[in-house]
Amino acid sequence: MAEKDKWGVAHVYSSFNNTIITVTDITGAETITQWSGGKVVRSDRQESSPFAAMEAANRVADDIKEKGIAGLHIKVRASGGNGPRTPGPGAQATIRALARAGIKIGKIEDVTPIPHDGTGRPGGKRGRRV
């Protein structure tokens, strides 16, 4: 197989506090590069912004091009469990930035953990009373 045909997996964890992008090999065993919104912006409140996600995705794209990876399968994950099941604002910006950087995109998959009746949500029997 040619060196240009190498593929990896981008694990995008996008919460409402931060966006973390980890690129592994196709098996998921070896981490190739990892960037987060907190590494590319100065203030804490901007970590989850689409701009921070876009900057992190551009750094990821530069790193994987150096390593000879041509395409990525993307796994998007939200907080899940007892938390919100919708990805944060950085998820879509990450995918768009990776596509614009000239990286082939294979599958886009949602891997948010969903509870199968484990522990209950915070708030108690009658919910959060405001």
From Swiss-Prot:
> Does the UniProt entry include the keyword Ribosomal protein?
yes
Offer a single GO CC term for the protein: ribosome
Q: Which UniProt keywords apply?
A: Ribonucleoprotein, Ribosomal protein, RNA-binding, rRNA-binding
A GO term for molecular function: structural constituent of ribosome
Top-level division of the source organism's lineage = Archaea
| Region described as Disordered: spans on this chain | 109-130
> Which SUPFAM superfamilies does UniProt cross-reference here?
Translational machinery components (SSF53137)
User: Which GO BP annotation is one of this protein's?
Assistant: translation
Name the job this protein performs: Located on the platform of the 30S subunit.
PANTHER family hit by this protein: 40S RIBOSOMAL PROTEIN S14/30S RIBOSOMAL PROTEIN S11 (PTHR11759)
Question: Which HAMAP family does the entry mention?
Answer: Ribosomal_uS11
UniProt lists the family membership as follows:
Belongs to the universal ribosomal protein uS11 family.
Assembly with partners or alone: Part of the 30S ribosomal subunit.
Protein name (Swiss-Prot/TrEMBL): Small ribosomal subunit protein uS11
What species does this protein belong to? Methanosphaera stadtmanae (strain ATCC 43021 / DSM 3091 / JCM 11832 / MCB-3)
